[in-house]
A protein has these predicted regions:
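Beta->alpha loop/short-helix hinge microenvironment recognizer with preference
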Residues: 56-61, 88, 92
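Short, glycine- and small/hydrophobic-rich beta-strand elements in well-ordered beta-sheets
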Residues: 44-59
């Protein structure tokens, strides 16, 4: 089922979200506006960490990847309301470090796409947690 067409019964709650906004300038979503929207939408849940970076994909689409970690769960629909033009992944796989490496296109796994990232567009707030947050528990990383 398409993420944008979920039913209310599928309105799951998560602590980690990965968003992609295609053509953010079309929706006037500068980094400043995105930061403002994150602070506004997630303040009550306690923002642990977030980062973003711009990229031009292989098909030529300019887009912004955003990764957000919060202390309390938030409903998918609330995130969709805050970012109506974003594709939202609720099943974020990997540790925070792995997701940040993906966004930055760093490491062996992401090296082939390094040139798609736009220089000087990476932004982050908070410290990358040294624990893994799943939807059921937090585990210390070794």
């Amino acid at each position: 089922m398409d993420e944008k067409n979920k039913k209310a019964s599928d309105d799951i709650q998560r602590r980690r979200f990965m968003l992609t906004i295609n053509n953010p300038e079309k929706y006037e979503m500068s980094h400043e506006k995105i930061i403002e929207a994150i602070h506004s939408a997630f303040a009550k849940q306690g923002i642990l960490y977030f980062c973003m970076c711009d990229e031009i994909g292989e098909s030529g689409t300019y887009h912004t990847h955003i990764f957000i970690m919060i202390t309390k769960k938030k409903r998918w629909s609330a995130v969709q309301n805050a970012f109506p033009h974003a594709h939202i992944e609720t099943e974020v796989r990997g540790t925070a470090q792995e997701v940040v490496a993906y966004i930055k296109k760093e490491g062996k796994k992401n090296a082939e796409k390094k040139e798609t990232n736009l220089p000087n567009t990476f932004y982050e707030e908070g410290e990358i947690p040294t624990f893994y947050i799943s939807n059921k528990r937090a585990e210390m990383l070794e």
